[in-house]
Amino acid sequence: MATTLKNHHRRVAIISYHIGKAYGLSEERLNNLVIAAALHDIGALTVSERDELIKMDVENPQPHARLGSYMLDSFAPFHEISRILYYHHWSYNRDDQWVVTKGKVPVESYILHVADRIDILQWFTFSSRRNQYFFIANSQRFLLVGY
């Protein structure tokens, strides 16, 4: 397994949990957020596709988000998780996206988007395991600026 993928989903789930908790999400919404974070790249079906995602996420992240959402949408208990996944690459501060969705993007999608970006950035920034765990453990403090 590629080093860029190893434990990525777990780290994103942990970061998402801390942001969601600080944001004041209910227990149910927090649980859905953590599940969505753990599954957020399910639309990239192979490890090589996931590695490619890291390279192309900036240019066109939507195909895997839509595919992952569609995969889960038909399972009733995962309907809300599917909605979170569908929008997990939508930026909070993009007016054009806000107009298109008319404010219907779940806040969990924005939280997941930020957590995913932070993990990818910190993974490439911090080389030592000690720094990575410090960042994850303190993510709640670092991430509240935009919320």
Task: Describe each region flagged by the PLM.
Residues M1-Y147:
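Histidine- and acidic-residue-rich, metal-dependent catalytic cores
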